[in-house]
Amino acid sequence: MSASVKVSAMNAKTLFALCLVLAPLGCASALPAQTLSEDEILGQAEARIQKYRTGNADLRLLGADGKPLRNGAHVRIEQTQHSFLFGANIFMLNHCKTPAENAAYEKEFSDLLNYATLPFYWWGYETQPGHPNYADTERLAAWCAAHHIVMKGHPLAWNEGQPAWLPADLSDAMRLQMQRITDIVGRFKGEIGIWDVVNEATDFDRDSTRKGGPTLTAGIRQMGVQDYLRTAFARACRANPQSTLVINDYVTSDDYMQKVITQLADETGRPLFDVIGIQCHQHRKDWSPEETWQICERFAKAGEPLHFTEATILSGHQGWELRTGNPQFDWASTGEGEQRQEKDVTQFYTVLFSHPAVQAITWWDLADQGAWQGAPAGLLRADMTPKPAYEALLKLVKGRWWTRTEARVARQGRAQFHGFYGGYKVTAEDHGREIVGTFTFDAKSPQPVEVRLN
């Protein structure tokens, strides 16, 4: 098929699907695919990071009186936040075994991360009909807001389980499922702005879902997966049109693209999602840089941002089967495993941070204590002490990928610097008094960025 197909001869949905097929030919809404070797992926990562994650900022600095700072004034410019979202689920906040461990969990989370995934699993969130656990969410949200941490809710719709009280009638069950989306997104409008709307729809009808969520699974089957997806996302959008809506899946093959992503559009063909979520639990084997890059390239063809929503690299023995038939198996972190985890985590984050389509990485789980599957998945050990992988990430996220610099003010209060995209604090002296201003800066920021210091 030629890339010169006339747009006027097709509807918008066909065009969206065509963009996925023709992405390597340069479809305007998609990134061109790049096939790179491991040496190229890693060797060129720093250059890509500089290209996609940093820029030149032109500031216009004003004092409290609205007048430009004096020519020659010295200013300190310090980053306070990343635009890129470095996150983890926050399920263990206030649920660790001891107060000291709770305090350590809070500190290590807020020291490293700016993004948190909050739990909304229906079967545990609403154990009695009409009584969702909003109070616990409000406590989590208050802590995140106090620490300037962006929040995401996960998941609004997932048929891996279901409330014990869910009606057996399929139409009633699906009506309640959709109403839940409306209620939750509307309730937390202004607090939680990102949502995993539908989880794992590609292979929704599998053994575990038929066992754990039989009514919901049958309801999706009866409704049709496309209508299920469209209705869920339309509900979320109506409840908060400003929210960022994520489709999330563990499937990383073309099936996800063909069965879900290309189908998730309204009647005009406009995509109903804002972000493609990619799970990346590496319990059995760590992904190579080539695998990670290829997955980025595969889904970047859709022309929408990518979030790596559930990232796991173990610091112990690898394999899903280790606890099969032996739930008491001590799946512990090991010294050798921690060294391997440090290396692979560093490579994994470097590759993702260097890819222009990726906007977020969420680690699953921050600590071994309470980790999914009981695996040594954390960046912290069970006692909340940091593993080498945590320390390595901290050196990247708040070190190599973080900006602290100084500048001299030129005429009309202008000052320039080169830095990573995000939030900043600028400090200057005015007649012996320290004055401070804040600003944000990214690739789309209008220049100059005007900053008032007080």
Predicted features and spans:
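Bacterial N-terminal signal peptides
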Residues: 16-26
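Beta-strand-rich domain onsets/edges
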Residues: 31-93, 152, 224-227, 231, ...
